Amino acid sequence: MEQYETEEQQVEAIKRFWKENGLSLVIGALLGLGGLLGWRYYNDSQIEAKEQASFAYQKASEELKKGEMGFGQAKSFIDSHSDTGYAILMALEMAQQAIERKDLVEAAKQLEFVVINAKLSAVQSIAQLRLARIQIEQGEFELALTSANKVSDQAFKGQIQEVKGDVYLSQELFDKARAAYSAALETNNRDQVLKMKLDNLAVAANG
């Protein structure tokens, strides 16, 4: 997967991929299978269902952006399209909205749905790391470490170490925090936030 500096960029890239390629992938798959099995095994309703799911996702996403009033429609969308990639994207959006409203319980619930149901490793990793950060905010440090350790995708190695550093810092385990932040910085030495965390860590450790 192409490298992105932040999880937000990763999520936006995935959303763009689905919007731009979701239907074409379905059509392409049908064309390929049609050459082997014949179009008689497939009908227009399959493509139509994908189009409807895409339209419903766009509509629910727009309503969700309007605030809490759109939360119910977003939940209904997930219930109706739980077996599609659009449900995963909607859950990620709902989690972000919940975080902005300081509803960490709801945010964690949506992220857990993504972790369980997402088919792509990158999406699972994003959700798992966001869940770990929420658990830090809730003071659930051991759970946060467990969540971070569940991420096996090496593309997220730096973010895993950063989350661990945040946990250790919250626990005032300064040596472990420094080691984790340093390991994270090795994967992206341009990350100014990580550099700032290391600088602040030195102050905290001496305080």
Where are the language model's segments positioned?
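Acidic, proline/glycine-rich low-complexity intrinsically disordered segments
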Residues: 1-7, 12, 58, 62, ...
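Alpha-helical tetratricopeptide repeat
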Residues: 50-62, 88, 92, 125, ...
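Transmembrane signal-anchor/signal-peptide helices with a preference for the extracytoplasmic
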Residues: 34-55
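Helix-turn-helix repeat elements of alpha-solenoid scaffolds
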Residues: 27-34, 63-73, 101-108, 133-142
